[in-house]
Amino acid sequence: MIETKRIYTTQNVYDALQDRLRFIFEEFDNIYLSFSGGKDSGLLLNLTLDFQKKYFPNKKIGVFHQDFEAQYTVTTEYIERTFQKIEHDVEPYWVCLPMATRTALSSYEMFWYPWDDTMQSAWVRPMPNHPYVINLEHNPIATYRYRMHQEDLAKQFSRWYRSSHEFKKTVCLLGIRADESLQRYSGILNKKYGYNDICWISKQFKDVWCASPIYDWSLSDVWHANYKFGYDYNRLYDLYYMAGLKPDQMRVASPFNDYAKDSLHLYRVIDPEIWAKLVGRVQGANFGAIYGRTKAMGYRNLTLPAGHTWESYTKFLLSTLPARLRNNYIKKFKTSMEFWHTVGGGLEESAIEELIAHGYNIRRNGISNYTIMKHSRIIFVGKIPDHTDDIKSTKDIPSWKRMCICILKNDH
C-alpha cells in the first residue's frame, strides 16, 4: 500500500508555480496548454504566458481548446477574446470535430455528438471561423476517428502534437487542482506513472506527459491571482454568483453531463436563445432542467411500485432499456458488486457501528487508499442489501435501491 500525506512548506503557491514552470520549460521540448474556458485553465494560461514572455521568449507554446458546441454565449465570448489576444503569441488549436460526449439526460442516448456534421442545421451555435480551427474540412490530426470519445480525441491530439513537432518530448499543461474533488486529489498523487518521482506530472504515451502545475492551488488562490494581476476571465462566474450558485456548483462544462445537469435550468434564465437550441439538440434537456434541481428522485423519498422489491424493480427497469444501454448498466453494477464483495469501501467508524447494530453482514478489509482520513475498508458478505434506509449516517453503501436510482437518474 502506498502511503500519501500532505507536506506543507513555507513557499507560497505562486512561487511554487514559477519553479514548476521553469522546470517544465527546461525539461520539455514541446509544451502546449489545454484551455477549456474555465477559471483554472484560464488562469494557468495567463500565468504561463507571463512566465514564457519573461524567461523563455523564444519558446512558443501551443494552446489546445476542445470545443463542445453547447455552451453559454458569455463562455464563447471569453474564448473568442482570449484567442484573439494570444493568437500571434502561441500556436492556437481550436478543435471542433465530431466526438462522443456523455449525456446524463436521456435514457436512450448514452452520448451526444458536438459538431455532428449530420446535424448541422441543429447546431447550438455556428462553427467558429478562424484559420486555426480544426474541423472535418481542416483536420491535420491523422489519428482522429470519426465520433471518437472526447477523452480519446484529447489524447490523440497530444500524440499528433508530438509527431508534428519533430517527435520530441512533449508535455500538456492542465489546470487541474487537487481540492476540486477527492478523485482529482487521488489522481494527482498517483505516482505509478509519475515523471522522475514528481507527482504532478504523469505519462500519457511515449515521450508525451501531462502536468498539473497548479494542483495545490485553492479556489481563493485562483480568484486572488485573477484580481491581483488583472486577468480577464469567463464572466459566466459573475452570472453564476448572481444566480446564487455556490462555488463548487460553478462549472464551465457541457450542459448535459453529470456535473452540469443540476444547473441546466439556468440556461433558460441566463441565455434563453441558447436554451431554445439546447432543447432541440439533446433528448431529455427540458426534463433535466425541470427535475435536475429538485428532489423528484431523492434517495429517501422514492417509493417502490406495489409488488416489487428494489432488486426486482431494478431488473424490470433494465429489461425496458435498449440492449446497449442495458449492458452498460449491468457492467457498471457488476463492477460495483465485485468491489463491495472483494475490496470494500472506506467508511467512518460511526457508519460501521450503525451497520453492525442493524445486523448487516460486513467485515473489515484493511485501510482504504481512497480516503484521506484512512477509514477502514468494509466488505459486504453475501447478498447486496435490497435497501439501506435504516442507515442514517451514510448513503455511500451498496444496495439495489441505489442501483435503481442510478437508472432513474440516467447515471450511466
Where in this protein do the model-derived segments appear?
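The Walker A (P-loop) glycine that initiates the GxxxxGKT/S ATP-binding motif of P-loop NTPases
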Residues: 35
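Nucleotide-activated chemistry modules centered on ATP-dependent adenylation/adenylyltransferase
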Residues: 1-32, 41-412
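Conserved G/P- and acidic residue-centered "switch" motifs that form tight phosphate/ATP-binding loops
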Residues: 38
